[in-house]
């Protein structure tokens, strides 16, 4: 029995279809942003717990980075969704992190977490969500109001619209 339904046979020319799904982790309340590290493990954001988890196939989940989306939990304006979300690596193995609580994109080199993009036109970002690093190093990310109070745009503090940036 195949684990997915195939509607167009042509898809087999582009993706593997001979696989079985495997549950790697079920201990998170809301996880997002999975990314594969070439050293042989997965990272993912556990948003409400404000951590990035690490899964090495065949081993239990471990914490890779704490305070991944919000560095000052006491002052978080997004208490339920303050953690990181989207994750992406660049060619130099830096991890770029969408930070809901800090309203920013951070850069992590494996030792130091630093703010990378903190605002646009002198206003904080809303709630950076998904991120991709292109071959040339360009960074693309989305910035919807997810996590903001009632998921509403708040132009006096943050961006006046949900945006997509490069």
Regions found by a protein language model. Give the residues of each.
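Sequence-structural signature of mature extracellular/luminal beta-sheet repeat domains
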Residues: 1-166
């Amino acid at each position: 029995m195949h684990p997915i339904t195939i509607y167009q046979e042509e898809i087999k020319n582009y993706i593997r279809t001979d696989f079985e799904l495997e549950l790697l982790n079920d201990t998170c309340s809301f996880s997002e942003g999975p990314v594969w590290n070439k050293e042989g493990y997965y990272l993912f954001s556990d948003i409400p717990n404000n951590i990035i988890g690490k899964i090495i196939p065949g081993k239990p989940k471990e914490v890779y980075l704490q305070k991944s989306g919000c560095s000052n939990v006491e002052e978080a304006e997004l208490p339920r969704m303050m953690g990181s979300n989207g994750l992406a690596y660049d060619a130099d193995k830096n991890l770029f992190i969408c930070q809901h609580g800090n309203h920013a994109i951070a850069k992590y080199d494996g030792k130091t977490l630093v703010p990378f993009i903190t605002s646009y036109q002198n206003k904080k970002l809303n709630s950076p969500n998904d991120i991709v690093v292109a071959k040339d190093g360009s960074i693309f990310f989305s910035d919807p109001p997810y996590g903001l109070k009632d998921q509403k745009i708040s132009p006096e503090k943050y961006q006046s619209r949900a945006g997509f940036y490069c």
